[in-house]
C-alpha cells in the first residue's frame, strides 16, 4: 500500500491506533518521529515542547532518565501529547518470555502500558511475547495500544536479517490486531488485503553517515521514497550537540513530507 495516502490508509485500517496515527500524520503533514534520549526530565520535556509541532510520534527510552518519576515525567509528557497531538512510542525492545514481559510492560516504576501508545519487541522468544504484552495492555488500559516487531535494525553487523526477519514477520501475523507494524529498513510487503503494516525506520540523517558505535545513517529520501518506510526516526539529527531542535524539526519534517509526496507521484 505504498502508493496510498496516509489518509486513505487511515480510512482502510481496522486498527484504532493506526487510524489515529495516520490521521495525525495527515493533519500535521509530518512523518517525523523524534527520539529524545536525554538523562534529565527537564531537558526531556523542554525538547518535546520545542519539537511537538513538527512530529507525529515521540520516541522515548524512559529508563535513561536519572530523575524519573511518574508524576513529574509522565503526567507532563501526557499533557504535551494532548497539546501537540502526537503519539508516544516507548522503545523498550522487550525480549523475554510472555509472563515476564507482561510485568515489565505494566508494572514496576515505569508502568509503560498506562501511557505509551506504542512499544516494541524482539521476535527471539516467539509468539508468547506478543500474547503477554497484549494481555498486559488489555488489563491496564482502555486506550488503544500497539506493538512494533523489530524486523531489522540500522546498526552495523545486525543479525536481524534474512530468516530471522521472516520469522519475526510470521510472529507479527499471529496477532494482526495488536501488532501494528515493524521497526525495519524498508516496506514490509502485505501477504493479503487485510495487512497494512506501519514501518518506522531508525538510522535517518541528513548530515551524518554514522558514528563510532556502529550506527549507520541513510537519507530521508532513501528511506521514504526509495524503501517505502512510513515514519522516519531521528534523534541526534534533531537534538545533537550544536543543533537547534526547532530548526531541525522544521527541516526534517519538510524532508520527510517531500519524500512521501515524491513516493506518491
Curated annotation (Swiss-Prot):
GO biological process entries: 'de novo' pyrimidine nucleobase biosynthetic process; 'de novo' UMP biosynthetic process
Say yes or no: keyword Lyase present: yes
Q: Where do the annotations place substrate binding?
A: 37, 59-61, 91-100, 217, 236
Active site at 93
Keyword Lyase present in the record's keywords: the answer is: yes
The EC code for this enzyme is 4.1.1.23
Classification via InterPro entries: Aldolase_TIM, OMPdecase, OMPdecase_AS, OMPdeCOase_dom, RibuloseP-bd_barrel
Q: Name one GO molecular function term.
A: orotidine-5'-phosphate decarboxylase activity
Protein family (similarity comment): Belongs to the OMP decarboxylase family.
| Name assigned to this protein | Orotidine 5'-phosphate decarboxylase
* Gene designation per UniProt: URA3
